[in-house]
């Protein structure tokens, strides 16, 4: 597959139009708005950037790289192990539901689009639940998308969904959201670099320590008025 074909496949996979429901989740951002921690564009940008650098970069992003590596190697045992590990690290019912629902939707799409080999699709179908990073890395391997490029798209898509949530819930203007997303490019690149460092370590350096995020996600479960499912 040529570089241009890979780029188009990556744009397809990271598109907000992909029918996996990412727009319906805020991952604690809505609770941060409710309690006043996020109340304008600068605080929203700081929240999203800090989440990228200090939460995603320490756990989900390096785990994403490990999953991509094991899908490429055809190592179904390690894929299942890391999928189950990631599911166990989701601290609240909403975060678990989010990764389960989006992972299931993407796995179903992979099957319907017949991406990848039959063996890859069978391994993915056998996972229950299947988490979003597991399904996304399977799609990247199926479409011959490299690890760094795929992770950058995954992190940018995450940031894009967060900015869209901030636009709706703070609320912010569309242009303010685009300025914010542009300034977050550096945080996305930092996240990819840190994830590569952590994934290459022996053993991999993964950390799930994000107590404030866990508390806010738990509070969101009983929040009176909500736009988002997490």
Curated annotation (Swiss-Prot):
Subcellular location per the Swiss-Prot or TrEMBL entry: Cytoplasm
Keywords associated with the record: Chaperone, Cytoplasm, Nickel insertion
This protein's record includes keyword Cytoplasm: yes
Iron as UniProt keyword: no
Known role: Required for maturation of urease via the functional incorporation of the urease nickel metallocenter.
Protein family membership: Belongs to the UreF family.
Stored InterPro entries: UreF (IPR002639), UreF_sf (IPR038277)
Single GO molecular function: nickel cation binding
Main location: cytoplasm
Protein name, per record: Urease accessory protein UreF
PANTHER family, alphabetized: UREASE ACCESSORY PROTEIN F
Assembly and interaction partners: UreD, UreF and UreG form a complex that acts as a GTP-hydrolysis-dependent molecular chaperone, activating the urease apoprotein by helping to assemble the nickel containing metallocenter of UreC. The UreE protein probably delivers the nickel.
Cellular-component GO terms for this entry: cytoplasm
Annotated organism of origin: Cupriavidus taiwanensis (strain DSM 17343 / BCRC 17206 / CCUG 44338 / CIP 107171 / LMG 19424 / R1) (Ralstonia taiwanensis (strain LMG 19424))
Extent of the signal sequence: none
């Amino acid at each position: 597959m040529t570089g241009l074909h890979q780029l188009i496949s990556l744009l397809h996979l990271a598109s907000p139009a992909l029918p996996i429901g990412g727009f319906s989740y805020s991952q604690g951002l809505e609770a941060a708005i409710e309690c006043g921690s996020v109340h304008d564009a600068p605080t929203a940008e700081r929240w999203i950037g800090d989440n990228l650098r200090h939460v995603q970069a320490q756990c989900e992003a390096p785990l994403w790289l490990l999953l991509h590596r094991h899908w490429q190697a055809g190592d179904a045992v390690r894929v299942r192990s890391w999928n189950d590990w990631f599911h166990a690290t989701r601290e609240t019912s909403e975060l678990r539901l989010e990764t389960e629902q989006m992972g299931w939707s993407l796995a179903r799409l992979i099957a319907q689009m017949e991406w990848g080999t039959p063996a890859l699709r069978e391994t993915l179908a056998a996972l229950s639940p299947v988490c979003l990073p597991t399904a996304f890395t399977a799609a990247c391997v199926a479409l011959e998308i490299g690890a760094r490029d795929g992770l950058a798209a995954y992190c940018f898509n995450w940031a894009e969904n967060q900015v869209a949530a901030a636009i709706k819930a703070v609320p912010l203007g569309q242009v303010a959201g685009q300025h914010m997303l542009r300034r977050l490019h550096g945080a996305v690149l930092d996240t990819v670099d840190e994830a590569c460092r952590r994934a290459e370590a022996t053993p991999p350096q993964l950390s799930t320590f994000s107590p404030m995020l866990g508390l806010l996600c738990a509070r969101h479960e009983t929040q009176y008025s909500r736009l988002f499912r997490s």
